[in-house]
């Protein structure tokens, strides 16, 4: 028999859905029913989500200065809050947990107005706009990188780390095996769950600058946008190299586990998964983020020595080619980076976050939770 329902709310990108998925597995293990409320974008990421039910409520972001668009967004938001109130009255959750993204705003606002215990989890080192708007209203804030002794609400913030999915925990069991001269070198390239156009242009050019013996060693897994598939595939065929190119890989954790080097953006989930699995990486923060959250995430892991951070403006194909050449000829250096990254990982983040959810659902104060250390 279920202990009750926990309602998780997450925006429809992998960065929001994946940590919610990790928590959902942990809560199910502890006997709770889990419902997910999200938007239509999450469909591609929610295939393995262990939710008893998935709900979609209307929501919108208010980013335009056009008064007509603002009015439409406000109406959609109001409609979403009404739908969320109806959902909460129907399923009667013990607690509502938000993971960021504008689709979390209606259910979290509805919960706080209805007196239902609510909390948020912020994956990044800098709080996102949706979570920032909700932070004052909820009982507790869990953070992937947020410090407990800083920020606006230190008294109700707990640094749990970012929960990672079971597939990541499984991949972490595989030790890092340094590359061997003349053997295949596995390079994994991705730009977060939505891909990165920049890598689609820079990586093939950089590889073309490598000497033929090095180029023939490369085995590349690269996530690209659908519109870039043909171009990237054409480049890899011309270079006569082993490549697996796709818009999305459902087994990305396993592929990272098999990598000698990872080249990627530095979203919170990505950084956390790299650390738990323990793989060396070149992080290229997304340069147009409003709050520069990816740069802050990257800096947190770079401080351990597990990754190198290079701004996109500085990473020319020539520089990337030089980096790849060095990585393929200095396996000991990558092995040290892998060990440093793994030491920074928090594989128990999902358990700590589940402890926190249970405390809030039981209407314990977050101060009591922090004081008890349980």
Swiss-Prot record:
Disulfide bonds: none
EC number: 2.4.1.227
Annotated membrane topology: Peripheral membrane protein
InterPro entries with a match to the protein in the record: GlcNAc_MurG, Glyco_trans_28_C, GlycoTrans_28_N
Positions of UDP-N-acetyl-alpha-D-glucosamine binding: 13-15, 124, 165, 193, 294
GO terms of biological process kind: carbohydrate metabolic process; cell division; cell wall organization; lipid glycosylation; peptidoglycan biosynthetic process; regulation of cell shape
Catalytic activity: di-trans,octa-cis-undecaprenyl diphospho-N-acetyl-alpha-D-muramoyl-L-alanyl-D-glutamyl-meso-2,6-diaminopimeloyl-D-alanyl-D-alanine + UDP-N-acetyl-alpha-D-glucosamine = di-trans,octa-cis-undecaprenyl diphospho-[N-acetyl-alpha-D-glucosaminyl-(1->4)]-N-acetyl-alpha-D-muramoyl-L-alanyl-D-glutamyl-meso-2,6-diaminopimeloyl-D-alanyl-D-alanine + UDP + H(+)
Purpose: Cell wall formation. Catalyzes the transfer of a GlcNAc subunit on undecaprenyl-pyrophosphoryl-MurNAc-pentapeptide (lipid intermediate I) to form undecaprenyl-pyrophosphoryl-MurNAc-(pentapeptide)GlcNAc (lipid intermediate II).
Pfam families: Glyco_tran_28_C (PF04101), Glyco_transf_28 (PF03033)
Protein's cellular compartments: Cell inner membrane
Designated name of the protein: UDP-N-acetylglucosamine--N-acetylmuramyl-(pentapeptide) pyrophosphoryl-undecaprenol N-acetylglucosamine transferase
Record-level Gene Ontology MF annotations: UDP-N-acetyl-D-glucosamine:N-acetylmuramoyl-L-alanyl-D-glutamyl-meso-2,6-diaminopimelyl-D-alanyl-D-alanine-diphosphoundecaprenol 4-beta-N-acetylglucosaminlytransferase activity; undecaprenyldiphospho-muramoylpentapeptide beta-N-acetylglucosaminyltransferase activity
Pathway(s) where this gene product acts: Cell wall biogenesis; peptidoglycan biosynthesis
Coiled coil: none
Top-tier EC class: transferase
Family membership: Belongs to the glycosyltransferase 28 family. MurG subfamily.
Keywords: Cell cycle, Cell division, Cell inner membrane, Cell membrane, Cell shape, Cell wall biogenesis/degradation, Glycosyltransferase, Membrane, Peptidoglycan synthesis, Transferase
Origin superkingdom: Bacteria
Any one GO CC term of the record: plasma membrane
Main location: membrane
Protein encoded by which gene: murG
């Amino acid at each position: 028999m279920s202990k009750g329902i926990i309602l998780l709310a997450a925006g429809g990108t992998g960065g929001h859905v994946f940590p919610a998925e990790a928590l959902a597995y942990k809560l199910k293990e502890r006997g709770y029913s889990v419902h997910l409320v999200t938007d239509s974008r999450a469909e591609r990421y929610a295939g393995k989500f262990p939710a008893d039910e998935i709900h979609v409520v209307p929501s919108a972001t208010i980013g335009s200065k056009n008064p007509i668009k603002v009015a439409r967004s406000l109406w959609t938001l109001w409609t979403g809050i009404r739908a969320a109130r109806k959902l909460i009255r129907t399923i009667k959750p013990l607690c509502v947990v938000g993971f960021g993204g504008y689709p979390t705003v209606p259910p979290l606002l509805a919960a706080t107005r209805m007196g239902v215990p609510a909390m948020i989890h912020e994956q990044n080192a800098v709080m996102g706009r949706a979570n920032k708007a909700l932070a004052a209203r909820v009982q507790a804030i869990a953070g992937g990188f947020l410090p407990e002794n800083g920020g606006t609400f230190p008294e109700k913030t707990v640094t749990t780390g970012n929960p990672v999915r079971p597939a990541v925990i499984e991949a972490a069991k595989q030790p890092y095996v340094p590359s061997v001269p003349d053997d295949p070198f596995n390079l994994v390239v991705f730009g977060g769950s939505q891909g990165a156009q920049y890598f689609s242009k820079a990586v093939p050019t950089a590889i073309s600058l490598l000497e033929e013996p090095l180029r023939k060693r490369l085995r590349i897994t690269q996530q690209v946008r659908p519109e870039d598939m043909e171009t990237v595939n054409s480049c890899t065929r011309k270079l006569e190299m082993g490549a697996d190119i796709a818009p999305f890989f459902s087994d990305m954790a396993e592929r990272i586990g098999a990598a000698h080097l990872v080249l990627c953006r530095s979203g919170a989930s990505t950084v956390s998964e790299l650390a738990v699995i323990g793989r060396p990486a070149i992080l290229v923060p997304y340069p147009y983020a409003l709050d520069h959250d990816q740069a802050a995430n990257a800096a947190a892991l770079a401080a351990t020595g597990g990754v190198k951070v290079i701004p996109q403006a500085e990473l020319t194909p020539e520089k990337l080619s030089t980096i790849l050449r060095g990585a393929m000829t200095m396996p000991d250096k990558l092995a040290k980076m892998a060990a440093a990254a793994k030491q920074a990982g928090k594989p128990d983040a999902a358990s700590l976050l589940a402890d926190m959810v249970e405390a809030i659902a039981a209407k314990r104060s977050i101060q009591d939770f922090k004081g008890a250390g349980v």
